[in-house]
Each structure stands twice: as C-alpha cells, then as structure tokens.
C-alpha cells in the first residue's frame, strides 16, 4: 500500500510503499493481549516479600505449658495467629516473566502496526529531527500536526536534539527502531514512523 510522506511542518514531500505483509495483516486482539501481558509481566520487579516464621524477630520460647492450662496448645509467639507474627503463604521474591514464542511476538508487532494503519493513526515523516533542543519549538510543530498523544519511531539512532526537545512534552515518546514494541505502540493514540524506521522495521519483520 502507498501512503504520503510528510515533514514535521505538515508539508507533503513524497510517497512511500508499505509492505502489506507487515502493515496490512488482520488485526487480532488475542495476539495483542498476549504480547502486552508478556511485556508487562516481564518488567515487573517481583521484589514483594513477607516474612516467614523463621525470619520473624522474637523469642523462640514456648509461651506456656503444653498441658494443664485449658487453652489451645501453642509452640511459638511468632506464629501467624499472633500479633507481629509471620504471614502464611505470603508473596516471595520471584520473576513474573513467562515465555512467549518468537513467532507470536513478531506477529504481535506486525498486528500493532497494522492496527494503526487500519485506524488511520499511522503517519510517515521524512525525518524526526530538530534544529535545537527547545521544547517550545517542537511542541508548536506537533500542535500544527494535531499530535497530542504520539509515539515517534526513528531509525537506528534518535536525533539528539529531537529527543531532548520531546522529553518534557507529555504523552510524547521517542524510540529507535530496535526499541519498537507492542505496548508502547498501543498506549499512544498516533504512531509516527520516519522513512528510516519503515525500512528498518520491514527488514526486521520480513
């Protein structure tokens, strides 16, 4: 499929051919769901922890005699039924990551790109660059394009001035091609690719 290439000043500067096998696949919500869950699970820190009975600070003395008191027998004041005691079956430090086949991850990225095309939310620009690292200047240019929630994906390296200028603009993210992922594509309303990004993504996903 063909689409227009524009500049950041909203001027049409040419056309580009988008590969149908990458930007025109059927949109499957189940694949996107699996990919987003995989990403979010993988980045969880998993450092939640409660103390077991062996880790609780306190006496190890038996609180009272086993027999003769008429009360239920107790062996430790660090047990879970006492104030300040341990937690039974509480969370432990662990990784939440789970496997997702490479083919599914690849299909999910194609699906996310195709979903943006299907929604009319994909824009191709000639370059994502800025003459100076001034946020005000870039914000004005994005305002002309009507971009309020946007992910920019550039080539192998992101323009330094553009990255600095966009850093303080809310809901504007910038990634190099190798950082392109399903979650970041879906969490922003509009996806903007540079021509270099299109070429790199097609090479990566073919």
From Swiss-Prot:
One of its GO terms (biological process) is translation. It comes from Paramagnetospirillum magneticum (strain ATCC 700264 / AMB-1). The keyword Endoplasmic reticulum does not apply. Belongs to the universal ribosomal protein uL4 family. This is Large ribosomal subunit protein uL4. Part of the 50S ribosomal subunit. Residues 49-73 are annotated as: Disordered. One of its GO terms (molecular function) is rRNA binding. One of the primary rRNA binding proteins, this protein initially binds near the 5'-end of the 23S rRNA. It is important during the early stages of 50S assembly. It makes multiple contacts with different domains of the 23S rRNA in the assembled 50S subunit and ribosome. Forms part of the polypeptide exit tunnel. Signal peptide: none annotated. Keywords: Ribonucleoprotein, Ribosomal protein, RNA-binding, rRNA-binding. GO terms for cellular component: ribonucleoprotein complex; ribosome.
